[in-house]
């Protein structure tokens, strides 16, 4: 049950889609699902990079680098597409800010690092694993159908919404899930969604004045959230991290 998973989260989310030769084992602890772990990793990685840039002790830097390197193993094993999209947005944003600041050394290092990560993802089979999972589980098509149903239902109660997610029998998933944007829109109407969008705009605008590398990484968190909240739910610790 979901309540038990919140209190005693499993170490991994085991998925057995119909027709798949083997089960997909996706690390999730200390969260109830691999998606929650992926989103937390998306939000906290830029924070750790900002912390790394501000540390003065070489030993603390080495310890943090080792910890971050080890954390990539379960993160990659989640095969979470949203996590890679969010981290890519953060990295691209920081690279753009460094480019606009004419910090060519940082730009060169950033391009090299991004290229190395892309090569590693293909070489490790991570990309093949993500694409292979889609052959047996059309989660993209299922989400699209759910989003259409959520939109149509919200149009019937656009001001105050429905208060809580509701099951869509034809899809088998509750409307108002699979993305915080849809949760806000379905549960609290377009008014609730507009208020959260205003909060995000103010957060992005207030952080645009940063001029340091660590500041760029911290500011990349709300920038990435402007996209990942479309398909990720900020329902556990993620919203606290953002705020």
Predicted features and spans:
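Short, aromatic-rich membrane-interface segments at the entry and exit
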Residues: 60-63, 82-84, 103-109, 215, ...
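Long extracytoplasmic/lumenal interhelical loops at the membrane interface
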Residues: 21, 25, 125-191, 203, ...
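Membrane helix-loop boundary segments at the extracytoplasmic
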Residues: 79, 183-188, 214-243
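Membrane-interface anchor segments at the N-terminal boundary of transmembrane helices
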Residues: 32, 38, 184-196
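Hydrophobic transmembrane alpha-helices and their immediate junctions
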Residues: 52, 58-61, 88-92, 96, ...
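A membrane-periplasm/extracellular boundary helix in multi-pass inner-membrane enzymes
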Residues: 1, 78, 95-136, 151-156
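Aromatic-anchored segments of alpha-helical transmembrane domains
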Residues: 69-74, 114-122, 222-232
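Alpha-helical transmembrane segments of multi-pass inner-membrane proteins
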Residues: 1-79, 84-97, 202
């Amino acid at each position: 049950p979901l309540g038990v998973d919140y209190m005693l989260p499993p170490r991994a989310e085991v998925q057995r889609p119909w027709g798949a030769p083997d089960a997909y084992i996706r690390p999730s602890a200390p969260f109830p699902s691999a998606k929650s772990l992926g989103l937390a990793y998306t939000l906290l990685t830029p924070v750790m990079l900002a912390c790394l840039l501000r540390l003065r002790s070489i030993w603390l830097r080495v310890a943090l680098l080792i910890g971050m390197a080890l954390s990539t193993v379960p993160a990659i094993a989640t095969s979470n597409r949203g996590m890679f999209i969010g981290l890519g947005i953060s990295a691209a944003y920081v690279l753009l800010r460094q480019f606009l600041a004419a910090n060519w050394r940082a730009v060169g290092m950033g391009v090299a690092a991004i290229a190395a990560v892309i090569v590693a993802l293909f070489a490790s089979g991570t990309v093949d694993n993500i694409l292979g999972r889609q052959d047996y589980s059309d989660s993209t098509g299922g989400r699209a159908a759910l989003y259409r149903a959520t939109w149509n239902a919200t149009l019937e109660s656009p001001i105050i919404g429905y208060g809580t997610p509701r099951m869509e029998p034809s899809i088998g998933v509750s409307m108002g899930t699979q993305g915080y944007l849809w949760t806000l829109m379905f549960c609290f109407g377009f008014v609730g969604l507009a208020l959260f969008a205003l909060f995000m705009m103010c957060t992005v605008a207030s952080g645009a004045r940063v001029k340091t590398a660590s500041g760029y990484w911290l500011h990349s968190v709300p920038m990435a959230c402007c996209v990942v909240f479309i398909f990720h739910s900020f329902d556990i610790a993620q919203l606290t991290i953002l705020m």
